[in-house]
A protein has these predicted regions:
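N-terminal cap/lid segment of alpha/beta-hydrolase-fold proteins
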Residues: 26-82
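Short beta-strand element of the alpha/beta-hydrolase
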Residues: 84-93
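Conserved alpha/beta-hydrolase
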Residues: 107-133
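Conserved acidic catalytic loop of the alpha/beta-hydrolase fold
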Residues: 194-215
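Short glycine-enriched nucleophile-adjacent loop
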Residues: 223-234
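A conserved short beta-strand
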Residues: 233-250
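The feature captures the conserved acid-bearing segment of alpha/beta-hydrolase catalytic domains
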Residues: 246-322, 326-328
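Catalytic active-site module of serine/aspartate enzymes centered on a nucleophile-bearing elbow/loop
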Residues: 337, 341-372
Length: 372
């Protein structure tokens, strides 16, 4: 046996292994395997429009033909021995369910993070967005994607507080890898038709009717829709809202508009009986960093100051009515650099831990008996 040759080969293998390890960069934390008991998708809600007349299958015209639309496409994943209350995740304006999936820089998003923690997840595209594009209001026609406007890609870079284009904020929790920015830009999604508030709320309420009690996560433009859904359906057991653009108050208790350089920010008045339904469930509102503390000449940023101020008042109003409400401005608890998308920021594991702790503190993380 040629022992000298074996020793040389062993040395070469060891050197190659060392080089591979060195070139691979810092070691990546091992992730547990995602195990699912079930996954699937369905559509909920929607409307049907039927033309008058009788359909002729031999000589078809528009007569008697129908369009089903205005539904929400839902994708679900269920781990074994799942916790009692699933998490329903609602994207914001110009977004679809991708918000909650893999982050723009390729890390686990909230969908995977919380499946690993034993929660079933339901992510969906609201009517007329993403995979829910079919609309009864304009037939098959899909509106042309608008060209660049004041909220084109560079505009939303500023509006969503990644930085002041083309510069990133120092310490921002968004990857500065150019590919990550392109991935984030690509997930912007137009509506295929205008979406009345009642259509969106009806679809998500239908989702709750189908799946039963669950916690609702909202983001940005879906914030106000979440308040209305919580008021409409008692199966919404808690609402955790990331940077809502509008908050709700009982009619008669709506605070004055907050003037900003981007326009006045207003609260939405809802019937007191509906507001009381929100009083009965745990509510939390979370805002990130780089929001002006005083009036700013940059309207895209100053709007957030007004929105945060009014939503902080919503929490105070819920508490005044006896509710269980929490307001968190992340820099005030030592978490800095977050953009308008904390669920996909670089520190989204930390942001997710805040949600996990809140669910535990409110008794919403149980398995077996309870949480119904």
């Amino acid at each position: 046996m040629n022992y000298q040759r074996i020793i040389k080969l062993s040395t070469l293998v060891a050197i190659l292994a060392l080089c591979t390890t060195a070139s691979a960069g810092p070691p990546q934390q091992a992730k547990s395997t995602i195990v699912l008991a079930d996954q699937g998708s369905f559509l909920v809600g929607g409307n049907v429009v039927t033309n008058p007349g009788v359909f002729d299958p031999v000589n078809p015209t528009t007569a008697g033909q129908s369009i089903h639309g205005d539904a929400a496409y839902v994708q679900y994943q269920m781990p074994p021995n799942a916790r009692n209350l699933p998490l329903v995740m609602w994207h914001g304006g110009g977004q679809f369910s991708k918000t909650w999936e893999t982050t723009p820089d390729g890390r686990d998003g909230f969908q995977n993070i919380f499946i690993r923690q034993g929660y079933s997840t339901y992510i969906f595209d609201q009517p007329h967005r993403g995979r829910s594009g079919r609309s009864t209001t304009n037939g098959n026609a899909i509106n042309a994607v608008p060209g660049p406007t004041t909220t084109g890609e560079q505009g939303i870079f500023v509006r969503f507080r990644i930085g002041i284009w083309p510069n990133y904020y120092p310490g921002v929790q968004f990857s500065t890898d150019p590919d990550a920015l392109v991935q984030w830009w690509l997930q912007q999604t137009p509506d295929t038709a205008p979406t009345p508030i009642n259509v969106a709320v009806a679809a998500v309420s239908a989702l709750y009717d189908k799946i039963g009690p669950a916690v609702l996560l909202t983001h940005s433009a879906s914030g106000i829709l979440g308040w209305l859904t919580g008021a409409a359906n008692e199966k919404v057991k808690a609402i955790y809202s990331y940077e809502p653009v509008q908050c709700a108050f009982p009619i008669g208790e709506v605070p004055p508009p907050v003037p900003t350089s981007g326009g006045a920010v207003t609260g939405l008045g809802i019937p007191p009986a509906d507001f009381e339904k929100l009083v009965k469930i745990p509510v939390a509102i979370i805002y990130g960093d780089n929001i002006p503390s005083d009036q700013s000449p940059n309207g895209n940023l100053d709007l957030w100051r007004g929105r945060m101020a009014l939503c902080k008042q919503m929490v105070a109003t819920l508490k005044a009515h006896g509710g269980d409400a929490t307001f968190v401005h992340l820099p005030e608890i030592g978490i800095t650099g977050n953009t308008h998308f904390p669920m996909s920021d670089l520190n989204n594991a930390t942001i997710g831990s805040l949600l996990s702790d809140w669910l535990r503190a409110k008794g919403l993380d149980k398995r077996g008996q309870g949480n119904t």
